[in-house]
């Protein structure tokens, strides 16, 4: 395999581009310049991804908020329907009582 500084952007045998190796800064001795470069690269990557992440977080928050409002709205609607059904049930009891009174009175 070609060394990292050979100038060949593709590995000619496999046709793949080389990529950065993952290193552990606590185990390997790195110079202050290398550590500074790593921090700069991490910051640049974070700033590049931040707007997309922020947009996704906003969309997720709005979706959850809409779901909460829908649940509350449905709850209020079903409670108002429940009262309506109670009134119908009372009317049905009264109608049954009248029918029973007519049947026993005749």
UniProtKB/Swiss-Prot annotation:
Residues 2-57 are mitochondrial matrix. It is a single-pass membrane protein. Residues 81-106 are mitochondrial intermembrane. Keywords: Acetylation, Coiled coil, Membrane, Mitochondrion, Mitochondrion inner membrane, Transmembrane, Transmembrane helix. The chain crosses the membrane at residues 58-80. The keyword 4Fe-4S does not apply. GO terms for cellular component: mitochondrial inner membrane. The keyword Repeat does not apply. Its main location: mitochondrion. Residues 1-28 are annotated as: Disordered. It comes from the Eukaryota. One of its GO terms (biological process) is mitochondrial cytochrome c oxidase assembly. The modification N-acetylalanine is found at residue 2. It is found in: Mitochondrion inner membrane. Pfam families: Coa3_cc. Core component of the MITRAC (mitochondrial translation regulation assembly intermediate of cytochrome c oxidase complex) complex, that regulates cytochrome c oxidase assembly. MITRAC complexes regulate both translation of mitochondrial encoded components and assembly of nuclear-encoded components imported in mitochondrion. Required for efficient translation of MT-CO1 and mitochondrial respiratory chain complex IV assembly. Belongs to the COA3 family. Along with COX14, core component of the MITRAC (mitochondrial translation regulation assembly intermediate of cytochrome c oxidase complex) complex. Interacts with MT-CO1/COX1, SMIM20, SURF1 and TIMM21. This is Cytochrome c oxidase assembly factor 3 homolog, mitochondrial.
